[in-house]
């Protein structure tokens, strides 16, 4: 008889904000199997193979697995964050942090339904045929996911004013910003694709140039929004990373943010040619050929 240990894991290795609804269920099922086969213990684990991972975001997973392994029945997942935050934070702060956790969990779930593994989706081509098909089927999931991410940011910025556990709360804020950026990227790309389709055959040039101004204008356009969101998220991620780790490997995610920024510079430049280089009855080029990511 060889002693058996069961090991669970936070679902964080391809998800920059953990998929708690998945990992909580995984914990329950693994613990159930461990009891069935008389396991002598349960191990929690988190993974940092992916350089986008902030381990502080997985702390609720660590707590859930540790608690669940000592219970005779599965934990009430709906009540978990209420109890978790009451133990960690003062009463005046706990409810706000609980709301932030729940909003983040909703945001991650909605966005994951749309894009799958969020780490990869953050850097993929939003104008590919595959991405635009995803957008068409998931507009509501992306929209709801972004709203929930923004809701979480409101709670977290309020909680950070307390000066309590600011390192963990800031990591959560970075997770919310990344979810916000991810949803924004695909919503904007889908909106641009819809605009391109509407005007692809012929167009009133005055109207078309005004619409294109909302996409590429120097001030307050969609592409400028993307520049700002990428740069802000990058610098926040850098700070959160250095709160947890040494600078080793930090250059990898930083380079990815830089590549994403350069990509949107290119998108803006190429889209701007549509407004001025084509006559009113001249067909616009195929969107994928115009904006292909290299």
Task: Show the residue positions of the predicted features.
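Substrate-binding groove of N-acetylhexosamine-processing glycoside hydrolases
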Residues: 1-294
